[in-house]
Design a protein with these regions (language model features):
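N-terminal alpha-helical signal peptides/signal-anchor transmembrane segments
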Residues: 3-33
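Intrinsically disordered, low-complexity polar/acidic regions
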Residues: 2-5, 30-217
């Protein structure tokens, strides 16, 4: 039991550190007129996440998009050098998000480029909590888009909402209307636990429910 409690505390400490990383991303957006792809790359690179935050799969930004904005959004991202870009999955929905920045932009993370996380129920629930509360929210267990056919791990995502600057955010409705997107991180569970506990060979089976709420506690 003592070992379980120590593990739980270690996980909580690390998750709070990851939350602060996301808050730094929100701060970057709030301090800038425009955060470009290069700016986001430079920001995440400066964090040296592999060394300082082992276990994190990346740090990204998912843009919130209304249906009448979708085509212009796709054209803009394609003009940045991604001619095949689209928002996935295809189909008409009342609202969309799209992962437009995710660093490091390696082979795994490129698999998530353009994915609408609102299209999947578990991710949607966490994103709605983050949007409505203004706080960090963590999803339940999912299989990340980053997974390949080998070494498939359970995963989860941490979200922090980004709102328009200079608007009132006192009510849920105001927060919903001011939403611009989410700074977020995906986590692969085994990699995360190795990063926290420093154990390379052990198979980890951790209950994600301890994080599945409106805030990390």
């Amino acid at each position: 039991m003592q070992e379980t409690e120590r593990t739980r505390e270690a996980v909580q400490v690390r998750m709070h550190a990851y939350e602060q990383v996301l808050r730094g991303g929100i701060g970057l957006f709030n301090a800038s007129e425009h955060v470009s792809r290069q700016t986001w790359h430079d920001y995440v690179s400066s964090l040296n996440i592999n060394e300082n935050f082992p276990g994190i799969q990346g740090i990204g930004f998912s843009q919130y998009i209304l249906p009448d904005e979708l085509q212009r959004h796709i054209e803009r991202i394609r003009s940045e050098g991604f001619p095949e870009y689209t928002v996935k999955p295809a189909g008409k929905r009342p609202e969309y998000t799209s992962i437009i920045y995710l660093e490091p932009f390696d082979a795994r993370n490129q698999r998530a480029f353009g994915f609408d996380m609102l299209s999947e129920a578990t991710r949607h629930a966490a994103m709605a909590r983050a949007r409505d509360t203004g706080h960090t929210a963590v999803s339940g267990k999912v299989i990340l888009k980053q997974e390949t056919s080998k070494d498939i791990q359970s995963g989860f995502l941490m979200y922090l909402p980004l709102y328009r600057k200079g608007v009132n955010l006192d009510s849920v409705e105001q927060r919903q209307n001011a939403l611009l997107g989410y700074v977020y991180s995906p986590f692969r569970m085994t990699n995360l636990m190795r990063g926290i506990l420093g154990q390379e060979e052990k198979s980890f089976d951790i209950d994600l429910e301890i994080y599945d709420g409106t805030e990390i506690s």
